[in-house]
Amino acid sequence: MIYLDNAATTLQKPQAVYDAVYDAMKTLGNSGRGFSGAALGASRMIYEARQTLCDFFGGSDPSRLVFTSNATEALNMAIQGMFLPGDHVITTQLEHNSVLRPLYAMQKKGVELTIAASGQNGTADFDAIEAAIRANTKAIVCTHASNLTGNLTDMPRMGELARRHGLFLIVDASQTAGVIPDRKSVV
């Protein structure tokens, strides 16, 4: 079988993934539910995973890492939990529905939204994004790799833009985290 939509659902997984899931289902308990060997094993595994991911993404504090069931839930949590009526958010034309739908929902609740045009080559237009910044702008929300064009956003540049203006940066790295070898291009 030739499966061409791997980035969306990752149909074929390495055997080690199946083995780890089977082992977890067979031997682990619920983290934080007591001091049994199974519960402590689950807590230890979560701690180690949190530390590994923090190191991978260059974080400084693994306790600040939050696990969700998937990227869509994480994006919804960040977008719906961060903005209040009157806040302004900038996103791009390149975004996936997992970013756009919660932003539209927040817009109905009084959050101001600007969707910046993309450049001619289907990448983020940094000039358009910077021109959209206002006094009440709180964040830029953008994808690292567009599922529309396949192009990458220059995240170090986007991060510098956000820092320069004191903005939060929410990155949808669903298509690239763990795939792009240079994590510094993601964060």
Task: Go through the PLM ranges and name each one.
Residues 1-185:
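Pyridoxal 5′-phosphate
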